[in-house]
């Protein structure tokens, strides 16, 4: 199930102090790792960033009252399934969380809304209900991630467009 990422860069123990304050858009090192794992598992970068922002606000030390932990807020059972040893490890959490998201994207044939809903509440529930899920928490979560996803797409487009008179 787990695919080893053969990039030497991932062997570094990301040196982010526990007291580092997360920023809404994420620390550049965290974004770098998130993008690299997104590329490795074939998941859109903007979707990964949107989920991380929604789940933990880019805080690798986040812990929910339900026991979800780390950047992608992995529950213990999901972490075990994806061989995540330390849910607070940036690399472990991103690798396991993004691989899980990639599996959900495959399970739901690329339908992002369903994959995001399943990321939030589990694939069994969404597989049974499909687009007919009515739980207000799930609907709200999917809408929040969709909004963040759109912001990520626009931010990326803004970065990719050269300023007039520069770089042309």
Q: Predicted segments — roles?
A:
Residues 6-15:
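Bacterial N-terminal signal peptides
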């Amino acid at each position: 199930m787990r695919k080893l990422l053969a990039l030497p860069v991932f062997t570094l123990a990301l040196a982010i102090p526990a007291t580092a304050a997360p920023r809404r858009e994420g620390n550049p090192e965290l974004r770098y790792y998130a993008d690299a794992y997104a590329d490795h598992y074939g998941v859109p970068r903007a979707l990964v960033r949107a989920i991380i922002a929604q789940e933990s606000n880019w805080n690798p030390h986040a812990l929910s009252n339900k026991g979800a932990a780390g950047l992608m807020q992995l529950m213990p059972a999901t972490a075990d399934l994806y061989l995540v040893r330390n849910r607070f490890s940036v690399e472990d959490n991103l690798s396991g969380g993004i691989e899980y998201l990639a599996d959900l994207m495959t399970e739901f044939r690329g339908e992002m809304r369903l994959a995001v809903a399943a990321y939030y509440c589990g694939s069994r529930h969404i597989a049974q209900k499909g687009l007919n899920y009515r739980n207000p928490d799930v609907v709200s979560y999917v809408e929040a991630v969709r909004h963040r996803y759109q912001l990520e797409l626009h931010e990326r487009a803004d970065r990719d467009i050269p300023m007039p008179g520069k770089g042309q």
